[in-house]
Amino acid sequence: QLTTNFYSTSCPNLLSTVKSGVKSAVSSQPRMGASILRLFFHDCFVNGCDGSILLDDTSSFTGEQNAGPNRNSARGFTVINDIKSAVEKACPGVVSCADILAIAARDSVVQLGGPNWNVKVGRRDAKTASQAAANSNIPAPSMSLSQLISSFSAVGLSTRDMVALSGAHTIGQSRCVNFRARVYNETNINAAFATLRQRSCPRAAGSGDANLAPLDINSATSFDNSYFKNLMAQRGLLHSDQVLFNGGSTDSIVRGYSNSPSSFNSDFAAAMIKMGDISPLTGSSGEIRKVCGKTN
């Protein structure tokens, strides 16, 4: 039901408006590209790509922003809200927040040197959000390979899609609380890498939990295939990263992406399109929010 030209007459300047908003945000803070990409991922895995993650909590409404996977780590809301304001000025009441997020995720990847793809649009915005669904549906950094495969399979994404999409960890940062167990307790880790990461992540739980480390030690603000090379050298930061190359069924996919940037880029773009197709609201379902943080 989604098409690439859904707004071509109703909002002809949409793509350029989103692109310029992303460009200024990511040039002033390169990490923001990863943050926006992650927002889209966390949106799509909870009742589909419906903009539900963008709804702010109120006294009478509990949404997804304070679910475990998002609290203190989801960011980029202001960037999306600012882009939405600019789009509203140009085409009031036409473009959904869900679509703006989908386009911004693509623009973030491109801005950091990654592949381009045509974003399908026509999604509408959810009128509700579910903290419980966010807690249960978003893949966790502690997951095993089989759990990751199941989690992606539940939303129609293949094992290959899962490995390609994990390659998004070529950009962005992770908090110590999410890699502490790996750098202190696991053995399938490069020793020098473990020591380096321990420096900014104290062993004691609760100590330095929010300290950040780059998911890709080589090029944290370049969208490239070095994430996969790191996995082959046992320098995956999260448990859920290293399980992709640990003697299991996905080793060959990691090896392939490590050898061929072009095959990673094309598979990543295809998987992003598939992820963007998860359970959209279309037709008369949902609404077009006036502001992304609250329902109309």
Swiss-Prot record:
Ca(2+) 1 binds at D43, V46, G48, D50, S52. Ca(2+) 2 binds at T170, D216, S219, D224. The keyword Aminoacyl-tRNA synthetase does not apply. Pfam families: peroxidase. The record marks R38 as: Transition state stabilizer. Heme b binds at H169. It is an enzyme of class 1 (oxidoreductase). Glycans are attached at N185. InterPro entries: Haem_peroxidase, Haem_peroxidase_sf, Peroxidase_pln, Peroxidases_AS, Peroxidases_heam-ligand_BS, Secretory_peroxidase. One of its GO terms (biological process) is response to oxidative stress. The keyword Heme applies. Substrate binds at P139. Binds 2 calcium ions per subunit. CDD domains: secretory_peroxidase. Its cofactor is Ca(2+); heme b. Belongs to the peroxidase family. Classical plant (class III) peroxidase subfamily. The protein shown, TP7, is the principal isoperoxidase during winter in turnip. Removal of H(2)O(2), oxidation of toxic reductants, biosynthesis and degradation of lignin, suberization, auxin catabolism, response to environmental stresses such as wounding, pathogen attack and oxidative stress. These functions might be dependent on each isozyme/isoform in each plant tissue. This is Peroxidase P7. It comes from Brassica rapa subsp. rapa.
